[in-house]
């Protein structure tokens, strides 16, 4: 019975009680610690104020008091009255003028907002940060508004989570506190079985003493701790997720610890020789390949490995030696470089997925041409790269076998296949030591410059092109190949292009007419070696494939741009017809690609991406609140400004819209079926343009380089100083509720 009771105390119920008690204790300690910090800071600030006050008092005592000139009469001053100051003491009577200020109209109410020059995508707010104050009259009319608002956030309000809130700091402290219970129970179990396991315990103690220097940290907490925390806080993750989170948080607390993906500075003393993918990890993670910015806030998605490959060579080798000691003068060097080039531009063979290319046995005869060797090295390396997730052990085994083959001189003479081994009568390769920084930089550059070893040597700066070439030969079985784009179709003929172009223009018109109200956000498709059929996400969303998609450039669903030679401001332009701006990478004849003179561009359909906005002035409106006015005259259909703000989801827009409706002020603008632009908190000055049923501007959602953006254009010719209006597309009831004053129509 005693043993049964003892086991029950260690069950899940007991651990849940421990989690709750330790959690409340840590929360209380944190509140006490916070209160002590506030008291200490208050006393410190008060002491500083007293010291500063004492210094100022000493300075005032040393200064001479300047007498104030007292006016004897104020009757001659217009708009002033005479006021006298008397005292019950023996001070003389003082007469001062009192000037009355004229009444000034107050400025309209404006809520704080942050200026933006481009859209800013934000995540959904699942917690209500504050309960908005609407005034007593709003609560009297609709007493259930606050309750319904909280229900929209699933009852989660900021600050109202005493029993369910656990941050990273409390989580680590909670696990460490519960680990003491686990250690105590382990000690009790060890005492019960001390007679039976004395030898094993002594052996473990000896092992712990030996590993004390290499493993100074204590053992990892038990799984039952994370299981109990997961049961008490189910929204924080499962057992495995909590274990991984605890491991990451504790590793970050170690002095000098680096993230697992982080590599030492390539220019620092601790530079290491790593693979290309590891060196470029930060670049691939932070660099946006759609807007060419680091840490982009408009496209918060992670690129796939297929987007890392290059489709063209950065600097082609001209074939001329760079000097008397150039690598091209070595025997077999040109053949090796030509083999690399031929293999890079060659279409890779299509092998069944999930199967590896087996290595030929040692007794199998193989051709000894450099091309075949490079092909095998690249294929094997490609398998190694693909097998890092599934078959790392077999890759290491193959690499060791290759090293054995290279080190064996007898096998090298009979089965040598690299050009460096095909020249027995020339001098042996130089034995040059490569530092970690140089090796890492070489692996980064080889993916861009390929076989141009002269250019790579100039960029490295510390090695000759011959040394770079010899290092490339040694690295031929390690460097991952850069696979070129797989093109299954031959180049189109000119007549066929014209026919496809006409069919494409008709397809644009059909899409515009049939699904004008169904516009979805664009995401680049990525299905290697698969055509853009009904399973393609671009086709499903009824979007064209853009230049960011990983499909072939000959894809039938890809938008090819226009070939206009005019201003691209009529429906004769395919881009204008498809409600798109001309792409400077696709539209090469209309002037959209002319970037030298941005003010005199012949194409008039690229204003949003170039930021060719007009000068706007902010002033009180004649209709409601603030208004926006134009400084310079504009012509009809001319671009005025882009409507910028936060890009939020439709669900988030519904939650925010309930609050904006009560304020009777909304800056929400539908972007597409997936997202909405909200200029309430962040935006630009065009957010102050008011609504009118007879506007002088109009808004148009356009596709600009793969992004939907809102442009404000002139509906008619607008003169200097006119206030800008556009139609909010309110319903009749909403228009009466939001806008009670309509601007006066100007009679020409």
Swiss-Prot record:
Transmembrane annotation, as ranges: none
GO MF annotations in UniProt: histone H3K27 trimethyltransferase activity; promoter-specific chromatin binding
Cell location: Nucleus
GO biological process, one term: rhythmic process
Gene3D superfamilies given in the database record: 1.20.58.1880, SET domain
Broad class of where this protein is predominantly found: nucleus
InterPro entries for this protein: CXC_dom, EZH1/2-like, EZH1/2_MCSS, EZH1/EZH2, EZH2_SET, PRC2_HTH_1, Pre-SET_CXC, SANT/Myb
A GO cellular component annotation in the UniProt record: ESC/E(Z) complex
Paired cysteines (S-S): none
Disordered as annotated region, ranges: 184-221, 342-428
UniProt keyword Lipoprotein, yes or no: no
Matching Pfam families: Ezh2_MCSS (PF21358), EZH2_WD-Binding (PF11616), PRC2_HTH_1 (PF18118), preSET_CXC (PF18264), SET (PF00856)
Residue span, CXC domain: 505-607
Basic residues bias: start-end ranges: 347-359
Compositional bias per record (Basic and acidic residues), positions renumbered to this chain: 376-387
PANTHER family listed in its UniProt record: HISTONE-LYSINE N-METHYLTRANSFERASE E(Z), HISTONE-LYSINE N-METHYLTRANSFERASE EZH2
Similarity field: Belongs to the class V-like SAM-binding methyltransferase superfamily. Histone-lysine methyltransferase family. EZ subfamily.
Name of the featured protein: Histone-lysine N-methyltransferase EZH2
Species, as recorded: Xenopus tropicalis (Western clawed frog)
Lineage per the UniProt record: Eukaryota, Metazoa, Chordata, Craniata, Vertebrata
